[in-house]
Amino acid sequence: MLRVRFAPSPTGFLHIGSARTFIFNWLFSRHHGGVMILRIDDTDVGRNTEASLTSIFEGLRWLDLGWDEEYKQSERLARHREMAEAIFQKGLAYRDFTPAQSGETEKSGAQGTWLFNSEMRHLPAHESDRRASSGEPFALRFRVPRDTERQVRFADSVYGPQSKSTADIEDFALLRSDGMPTYHLASCADDAGLEISHVIRGQDHLTNTFKHVLIFEAAGVAAPQFAHLPLLVAPDGTKLSKRRHGPVVSVTTYRDAGFLPHAFVNFLCLLGWSPKDDRQQMTRQEIVEAFSLEGINRANTEVNFKEDDPFDPKAVWLNAEHIRALPVEDLAERLLPIVRTAGFPVDLPKMLAITPLVRERMKLLRDVLTVADFFFEEELPPYETSELIPKKGDAALALAVLEQAAWTLASTGFSHDGLDAALRSAAQSMGIKAGQLFEPVRVAVCGRKTAPPLFGTLEVLGRDTCLRRIDQAIAKLKEL
C-alpha cells in the first residue's frame, strides 16, 4: 500500500514551505487511496521545544486535512539503534572516539568539498572494542566506501535521475556519542519500519538522500521512492526564512489574518504544482483528483509579497473567491468569533443576516470588522457632513431628502421589499432620482458612501437605529 509521511521537527513554528510539503503528501496519499502519516522527528532533544510542537499541531489542524497515523521518533529509539547495530556488525560503520570539537576534515573529490575524515576509520577492531568496553564515549559513523569510487544513484520523481560519487560523501554519523540517533539514521530506520513507500520532501534534502540510499543498502532494505519539491523563495530569490522575512513565512500568520484553511491549501498547492489546465480556484476534492507528482515544477517558486503588503495577491484573491463560494451559514459561523473577540456581543441570527450583505466586499475574514463595523457599533465613527450631499445636489436637498426618508421609514413596514418600494416612491414624490435619495440615507445610516446593499442594511439595522442615525445626520446638516 502507498504510505507517505510528513516529518516535522519541533524546533520552530510551522513554515509555509513545510505546510506545502504536508499538503503535497496528503494530496498524493488521498489521490492514490494511501495512508498519510504524521511523524514528529524529535530526536534532537537539545533543540526541541514544547512551544514549537504546539505551533506545528495548531497549524496542521487549522489546515483541516488530517492524517491517518501518528508517531514520535523519540518513542522508536530502540529501532534506530537496532538498525545502527546491524550496519556496524556488517563492518559498514565504525566507532569514532574523536571528541566532537576536534574532528578533522580533508578536501577531496571532484567537487573539492571539505569532508569529515577520522583516523578512527582505520582503528583495529580489537582496539575499538577495548576502548568501548572501558566506557570511552564514541559516535558511530557510516563507513562510506573508499576503496573503489562508485556512484550512488536514485531516481527522483521530480528532478529525475540523480548520482553522486562516494568520494564526495563524508563518513556521516549514525549515532551521537550520547547514544542518540542522528537525523539520517532515525529517518531511514523509521521510513523502513513504517513501510514508507514514497518520501516527498523539500529540495534542500536532496543531498541528504545520497546518504540515505547508502543506509538503506547497508541495512538490506528497499529504499522508498523519492520526490523532492522546489523551494519557496522571496521576490529577491532568497529562501524564505523567519529571520529574514518575518511572520509572513508562518502558517499561523495566515490563520490569524483571516484566511480560510481550504483557500490557503488551494494557494499553497499551486506554488510549484499545476493541474495541467488553467484552473486556479479549486475545491479540495478537485485538487485531490488532479494531483500528481508529474505536475510539480523543478524551478523554485516565488511567494510574491512586499514590505508594506505581507500577503501574496494571489493568496488574497483566492481567499476572496472561496469566501464568496462558502455557504452563508458556514461563513457566518466563522465570522462570529472574530466579531465577538473584537468586543461586539453579536448573536448568530444577526450574523446570519449580515453575512450575505458583506461577503462580496471581503477578502479576508477579519475584513468583517471594517466592512460591517456599523452593524456592531452603537455610534458611527465621525464622517464629513459634505458626504451627505448627493450628486448634483446641495445641503438643502440633502436635508429635505433625509427628512422625507425619516418620515417614510417611520411609517412603512421594515422588510427589504417594503423599504425598496417605499423609498423609491418617496424619491418619485420629490421629483428626484432614486440615487439622490439613497446616497444621503446610506451615509446617514452607515457613515460612508460605499456600503452593502441599502435595503438589506436598513432591514438588519432596524427602524430605531436607522431613525436615530438619520436624525443625527439631519442635525449635522442644520449646523452648516
Put a short name on every predicted segment.
Residues 1-5, 247-249, 286-295, 337-342, ...:
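Short amphipathic alpha-helical segments and their helix-coil junctions
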Residues 416-461, 465:
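Helix-rich, typically C-terminal accessory recognition domains appended to large enzymatic cores
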Residues 4-10, 38-42, 194-199, 249, ...:
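Glycine- and acidic
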Residues 1-113, 208-221, 263:
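N-terminal Rossmann-like or analogous alpha/beta NTP/dinucleotide-binding catalytic cores
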Residues 25, 56, 87, 91, ...:
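Residue-level signal for inorganic ion chemistry
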Residues 221-382, 446-480:
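Catalytic adenosine-cofactor/nucleotide-binding cores of aminoacyl-tRNA synthetases and other
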Residues 95, 99-228, 233-241, 250-251:
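Active-site cores that bind ATP or allylic diphosphates and position pyrophosphate for catalysis
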